[in-house]
Every structure is written in C-alpha cells, then in structure tokens.
C-alpha cells in the first residue's frame, strides 16, 4: 500500500487506473480504526478494482468544546490494518494541505435542513465541516464509489444529499453497523469508556430494539420515546436526543410514514455515543 500526503500523487494514480477502465472505491476515515472501518474496506474491495482510503482528523467538524488534540492518532497500526484489508492507496493530508488558507477563509459546503437538527443542533457547524471535507476529498480522489457506515445515519444522509444536489458522479454506499457482542456499536469513542461503562452502554441498542417493537405494535411514538429516555437514564446515560424520524429526510415520523429510524445520542460519562435503528411498520 502506498501512503502519501501529496494530492498530485493521488490524482496521478487514480487517473492511471481510470485510463485502464478500472473502478476506484474510496473510504474516508479519521483514523483510530476499528472493525467497522475495516468492514468498509473489505466491502470496497468487493465492489471496485482499486481501493483508496484517507486518514484525516478534520478540525472543521470539531466544535469549540470538543478536544481535537485528544482524538487518538494511531497511524502505524491503521496503515497495517488498511493494507491487510486490501487498500492500495492511503491519503494522509495535514490540515495545511486541506485548508491552505486556514479554515476561516475556506469555501464551504452546507446541506440545509438535514444538517441543522439532531447532531447538527447539538454540534453547530459539525455537518458543514463534514460536507466540506468530504466534498474536497471527493474532488481530490475522484472515486467511482464511496463507502460510509450506517452508524452515523445523519452523516450518511448529509453526504447522499450533497452528492445528489451537486450532481457528483459518485455512488454512495451505506454499510451496516458493526457491533460488539453486547450490541454496542463499534466506535473509536468506545476506547474512552471503562469496562463498566461499556457494559452499561450496550443498553443503547436494547432500548432502540424495545422502542421499535413497541411502535410496530401500535404504541404512541411519544410514549415510546419517553419510555426510552427513562431506560437510558436508568442505565447511567445522559440522553442528548432520542427521536423517531422518517428515513427519507429525517422529518418527524408521521402516521403515514412506514420507513422509520430511531436516532439516539447520549453521554456515558464524558463520552458521547450515537446509534440508530431503521425499521418498518
């Protein structure tokens, strides 16, 4: 696997592959990789002739009260894991390469409506940072397909909407959430949890399972959400939000909506965890 910080080297290699009629898949990450990321790479290997990954801890998507410097950097281990999974090219730019004029002077991409609720309400500017860096990475790599985990359902919808609205010739593929045996969604943030906190954090998935079953049995969504809040609080969570929305646009679920998603964000100690569960009724 080739690792480079050079935009020109990425473009040269991808152009060479495309000139042969070969397809390119792209998996952007922030590093500190776990099995969920590796699953994305392995799925990409199945779907394209070549796989490009990136590792960039994007300062634009971190809020003022979020410690960018504390995010784990594990480049050597990440390189080995990506290579073993089948990635051929790894882009590891610095903030100065991605934002040469600084973030304040950087042109940006903002997806309205979807970006402003749920995680967007709790983390103002977060999805502007996500959309901007993903747009820039897409322009650098020029992939045919790009893969993202469904664990961050809102992020996936933001990216799908951006690609559609801006007519980008890229197929976006969502890959199912990878979970630990307890049901806890795999996340780089799980490393911040003690074993006791990890055990209690598994309640997040169980709560969503209970909620989806209750809604499918005809219970009121508001009553189900209220019960879910109680279940999370009893496990030691501090819920940020717990909502039931339409999968198409994240609008509040109406009686006509059949394709629904439960979206949750909650703090276990100082660690903010997110998860979601899609279901039909």
UniProtKB/Swiss-Prot annotation:
Transmembrane segments: none annotated. It comes from Shewanella sediminis (strain HAW-EB3). It is found in: Cytoplasm. InterPro entries: Cyt_trans-like, Pantoate_ligase, Pantoate_ligase_C, Rossmann-like_a/b/a_fold. It is an enzyme of class 6 (ligase). The active site is at residue 37. Beta-alanine binds at residue 61. It holds the Pfam family Pantoate_ligase. GO terms for biological process: pantothenate biosynthetic process. Homodimer. It catalyses: (R)-pantoate + beta-alanine + ATP = (R)-pantothenate + AMP + diphosphate + H(+). Pathway: Cofactor biosynthesis; (R)-pantothenate biosynthesis; (R)-pantothenate from (R)-pantoate and beta-alanine: step 1/1. Keywords: ATP-binding, Cytoplasm, Ligase, Nucleotide-binding, Pantothenate biosynthesis. Its EC number is 6.3.2.1. NCBIfam families: cyt_tran_rel, panC. GO terms for cellular component: cytosol. This is Pantothenate synthetase. The lineage of its organism: Bacteria, Pseudomonadati, Pseudomonadota, Gammaproteobacteria, Alteromonadales. Catalyzes the condensation of pantoate with beta-alanine in an ATP-dependent reaction via a pantoyl-adenylate intermediate. (R)-pantoate binds at residues 61, 155. Belongs to the pantothenate synthetase family. GO terms for molecular function: ATP binding; pantoate-beta-alanine ligase activity. ATP binds at residues 30-37, 149-152, 178, 186-189.
């Amino acid at each position: 696997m080739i690792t480079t910080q050079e935009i020109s080297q990425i473009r040269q290699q991808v152009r060479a592959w495309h000139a042969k009629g070969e397809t390119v898949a792209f998996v952007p990450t922030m590093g500190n990789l776990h099995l969920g990321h590796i699953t994305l790479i392995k799925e990409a290997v199945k779907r394209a002739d070549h796989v490009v990954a990136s590792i960039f801890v994007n300062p634009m998507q971190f809020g003022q009260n979020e410690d960018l410097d504390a995010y784990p950097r594990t480049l050597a281990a990440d390189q080995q894991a990506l290579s073993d999974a089948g990635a051929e090219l790894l882009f590891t730019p610095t903030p100065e390469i991605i934002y040469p004029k600084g973030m304040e002077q950087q042109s940006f991409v903002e997806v309205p409506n979807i970006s402003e609720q749920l995680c967007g309400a709790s983390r103002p500017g977060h999805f502007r940072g996500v959309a901007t860096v993903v747009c820039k990475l897409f322009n650098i790599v020029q992939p045919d397909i790009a893969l993202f985990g469904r664990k961050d359902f809102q992020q996936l919808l933001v990216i799908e909407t951006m690609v559609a609205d801006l007519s980008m010739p890229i197929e976006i593929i969502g890959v199912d959430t990878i979970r630990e045996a307890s049901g806890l969604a795999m996340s780089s943030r799980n490393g911040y949890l003690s074993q006791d906190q990890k055990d209690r954090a598994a309640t997040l998935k169980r709560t969503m399972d209970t909620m989806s079953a209750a809604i499918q049995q005809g219970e009121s969504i508001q009553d189900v959400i209220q019960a879910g809040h109680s279940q999370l609080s009893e496990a030691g969570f501090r819920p940020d939000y717990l909502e039931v929305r339409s999968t198409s646009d994240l609008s509040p679920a109406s009686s006509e909506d059949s394709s629904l998603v439960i979206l949750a964000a909650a703090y276990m100690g100082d660690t903010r965890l997110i998860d979601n569960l899609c279901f039909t009724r």
